[in-house]
Amino acid sequence: MPGVKYNAPMTPAVRPPSIFRRAFAVLGWTDASNVLLGGFFLIVFIIAYIWWPLAEQVIAYIDWRGQWWLYFDWLLVGIFLIMTLTIIARADLRRDLLIVFVGMCGGLVIEAWGTRTNLWHYFTAERPPLWIIPAWPIASLSIERITRLFNWGIGKVSHKPEEAGPSGSIFFKWSYWIIFIVFFGLMLPFIAPTFDEPYTIIALLLCVVLIATPTDYRYSVLTFLAGTGLGYFLELWGTTRQCWTYYTFQTPPLFAVLAHGMAAVAFWRAGLLVRVIWGKLVDRLHFRRGNAPDPEI
């Protein structure tokens, strides 16, 4: 009969991807995600191993023989899961190693400033404690992912070309100045008791320079919001568990929450500066190699 094919080759059945593969695809899992996730768990293991007495104090609060779920630190677990999921999303080692480097250096500077000026102190009385420093680059990676998600979402829903551009619309320009002027207004009275400290003056001047020289209004606002959002839960956990305490004894102070947004913007701007400097160094090195005399002549 016409149109009927005999002995047609059988096509193999295509199995749908497993739920794990679909989840990895949604998260944007890459080869670099394996490296970052392994490094993340390695840092957690090292901290728990070296500072095991601190981990024992946390575990001791839980009554494992009774209603342990009432004493379990669900907030910490939630923060841990959010950070884990975000740092593996669309991971790129070339970009992320710079974020880790800037976050580590910046976190060390911020913790040294805060603990040495007694704006806050840790229950271990270290100034600053080394075990808290790795939290900064991990948070920086998480904030970078959240910011890119915000930026992607705005690009999807925006129908105006100027809103999808690098600088953003007039809305982001106004939002930028309102947000950072309010932040600076909260910063001054909070750090006023330490105006006699050189660290505070340097921190204040750095904030003034960063605020007064915006490079991308939209991305600055989104980074600030992402840092503030994550910073709220970090500060809520740390201050209510008395892991660290501010001199105002607030749990947490509004300025401390917003300061995470400012730190995120500062780290992002520092990363841009490092890229520019590194690019110029590489170009100059290549230029010198290109103009070097041939030893065989």
Positions of the model-derived regions?
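Aromatic-rich, lipid-facing transmembrane alpha helices and their immediate juxtamembrane interface loops
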Residues: 2-297
